[in-house]
Amino acid sequence: MSQHETYRLVGIIRVMNNSVQHRKKDPIKRQEELLKAARIIAGREGIGSLSLNAVAREAGVSKGGLLHHFPSKQELIHALFIQLLEIMDERINIIMVNDSNCYGRFSRAYLHYIGELKESDESFQLALLSLAMPTEPVLRKCWRDWVLGHLEKGDEFDNSYLGALVRYAADGLWLSALTEGQTLSKQECDAIVSRLTQISFEKID
């Protein structure tokens, strides 16, 4: 082998090694691409159409590449739900930081976060996963753990029947708009949210 061919071969090996190292160093980016593909399919066709083959095609990877990150459909759905809960956490924490009154702050932040979701992609994806909970025990546990985690850090109001009332009413308004359409006017919705906000400041008897 000539010296030129040797240098050329060494160069090819270096490029291949760099490519492999780059792929190994970027698993988080690949997972995000796969989750993005899953979100697109869920939003476009519903959670029932979320197959591993469909996600692999949407993301432009092999099924084997997908299975390396998410060995099953359940794990993919679980990861998608966890990601949405992280987004919720971020949004709710921002609302809480900007609320100077610590009493009932979590329930109030939850109310306003849910009230502002409307018909966004985030809202639709969260609704699809929420409606899948009855048949997905892992999702139910994730949601339960998320709520209980916030209630542990919450106060007397958040852990009271009034706190539950505020949060459940927020869920009802949101799911009603998504499943039944807009049956209430904006003024009526605003009035309900305003009244629930007032309740979040009430002292527990």
Model regions: which residues?
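N-terminal intrinsically disordered/low-complexity leader segments
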Residues: 1-29, 205
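Short, amphipathic alpha-helix enriched in basic
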Residues: 7-11, 29-54
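Amphipathic alpha-helical segments that line or abut small-molecule/effector binding pockets
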Residues: 36, 100-118, 164, 190, ...
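Helix-turn-helix
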Residues: 41-75
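Hydrophobic alpha-helical connector segments
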Residues: 79, 86-125
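Short alpha-helical scaffolding segments that buttress acidic/His motifs in well-ordered protein cores
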Residues: 110-114, 126-131, 166, 170-173
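Hydrophobic/aromatic-rich alpha-helical bundle segments in the mid-to-C-terminal region
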Residues: 137-144, 148-205
